[in-house]
């Protein structure tokens, strides 16, 4: 099942080539296994972390955050919003940075079926037509990314309680996780033309202690994906409340997402900003209800 997808351009400066015949990469140490010093070096944002003294509280914390994530998916309704994307690519064959700025409608729809965490996330242009991405490197799947903490999927990852850290004036709980590739169903995909590679992620969640909602979620590849030459990719999602007038519904949704990565000999940076969330009703004709 898809948790996110990254789409690489198949035109312009980034023409894909056949993957090199290389041996699979050696398994890398995950966030769950790193020492605090190793983690801080990898993720400098953790430098002010107040380290946990034990893991005794972890099962209860996972139960509480799992309940909050499950409630989000139980309460989720089809939504659309305005997405402003800034995409910047650097590479040795570019005389200057490739810079793209686009505005889209970002749509997240509930898919029929038993698994409520599977959402259909798509983009259209502001008039509802097909989204034109050009040479942008784009990622999709941010709304459902917290599914790694859903009770039905927690057994597919390893977790570790790191401690407390202040984020946006809140003394948050910080938990790291790493997917177990042998059992994980929530996988990411990297798409380059007709090549699709499956990837597994590790991540860090900053959790509000009063509500156990995830305020910030960062994910990284567990290891490089050599089939499509993706060396690294880091996604950082910041969430906030969105209240809709219809039914007085409140959802916990992405407000800002940054994606950094290295593909082939190129580095890329994307900034996604979300605004004007609306409920999206799919009927004989499509209608939008504004908050």
Please state what every model-predicted region is.
Residues 1-12:
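Bacterial N-terminal signal peptides
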